């Protein structure tokens, strides 16, 4: 039933094992660390380079090895000093002047309901997604020039108004303004219309009517203060 094993099966085969050969470790060349020059050393190098004008020439091949070395050391020292002195721009927030801290919002497409602005009625009613406003919006350049126009009008008006009453040749006392736009003292105007109701300046018939010159009262007070 059972097969007898042969004697040859009990023998073991010899296997040749090759040992790996260890390669000699390759030594990497040591990296020379360049010394950091201080400011005093840089100053000495600058004096030495300034005394030798050939260092500033581009023909490095004509210069000697000492000159080239000093020039490179100077560039390295200047670069190292600049990197250490300048702060990193991305690490800190740039501080701006107080008068420049403005928040400007420009709406190039105002979502205003066109139908409601033109007619005052919108078929969508409260469900309209646009703004129901009938205000008049001015452009930015128009707002910037409005104050200049008002200032010019004020200067023109001040130049047109005499700084003293033309009847009494004195400062205005309770000034009045006629329908033709001329200014007089109240007392002078009353005395004038008793004789002649025409304007003393243009000759137009005033019909004895004049109103208080409220726009001239601040000017009159300023002249009195002076």
From Swiss-Prot:
Coiled coil: none annotated. One of its GO terms (cellular component) is Prp19 complex. Residues 1-26 are annotated as: Disordered. One of its GO terms (molecular function) is zinc ion binding. A zinc finger (RING-type) spans 165-203. It is found in: Nucleus. PROSITE patterns: ZF_C3H1, ZF_RING_2. Residues 1-15 have a biased composition (Basic residues). Keywords: DNA-binding, Metal-binding, mRNA processing, mRNA splicing, Nucleus, Spliceosome, Zinc, Zinc-finger. A zinc finger (C3H1-type) spans 107-135. GO terms for biological process: generation of catalytic spliceosome for first transesterification step; snoRNA splicing. It holds the Pfam family zf-CCCH. PANTHER family: RING FINGER PROTEIN 113B, ZINC FINGER PROTEIN 183. Belongs to the CWC24 family. Associated with the spliceosome. Involved in pre-mRNA splicing. This is Pre-mRNA-splicing factor CWC24. It comes from Candida glabrata (strain ATCC 2001 / BCRC 20586 / JCM 3761 / NBRC 0622 / NRRL Y-65 / CBS 138). The gene is CWC24.
């Amino acid at each position: 039933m059972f097969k007898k094993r042969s004697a040859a099966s009990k023998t073991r085969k010899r296997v040749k094992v090759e040992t790996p050969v260890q390669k000699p470790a390759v030594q990497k060349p040591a990296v020379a660390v360049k010394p950091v020059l201080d400011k005093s050393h840089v100053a000495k190098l600058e004096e030495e380079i300034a005394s030798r004008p050939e260092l500033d020439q581009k023909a490095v091949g004509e210069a000697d090895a000492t000159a080239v070395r000093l020039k490179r050391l100077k560039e390295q020292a200047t670069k190292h000093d600049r990197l250490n002195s300048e702060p990193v721009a991305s690490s800190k927030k740039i501080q701006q002047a107080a008068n420049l801290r403005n928040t400007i919002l420009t709406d190039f497409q105002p979502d205003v309901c066109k139908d409601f602005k033109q007619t005052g009625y919108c078929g969508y009613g409260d469900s309209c997604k646009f703004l129901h406003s009938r205000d008049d919006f001015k452009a930015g350049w128009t707002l910037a020039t409005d104050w200049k126009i008002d200032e010019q009008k004020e200067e023109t008006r001040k130049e047109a108004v005499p700084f003293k009453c033309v009847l009494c040749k004195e400062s205005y006392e309770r000034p009045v303004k006629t329908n033709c736009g001329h200014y007089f003292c109240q007392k002078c105007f009353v005395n004038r219309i008793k004789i002649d109701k025409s304007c003393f300046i243009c000759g137009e018939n005033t019909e004895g009517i004049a109103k208080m010159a409220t726009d001239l009262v601040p000017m009159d007070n300023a002249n009195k203060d002076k």
